[in-house]
From Swiss-Prot:
Gene Ontology terms: cellular component: extracellular region
Keyword Repeat included in the entry's annotation: no
Annotated protein name in UniProt: Calcitonin-like peptide 2
Species in which this protein is naturally found: Odorrana schmackeri
UniProt keyword list: Amidation, Disulfide bond
Amino acid sequence: SCNLSTCATHNLVNELNKFDKSKPSSGGVGPESF
């Protein structure tokens, strides 16, 4: 069990990380650069 907002933030970060890893690598600038 943990603080709800902490868990929500942690899960959101995990989802964003998975989303970023699913995108092709790019050396560009802007939202597509990770």
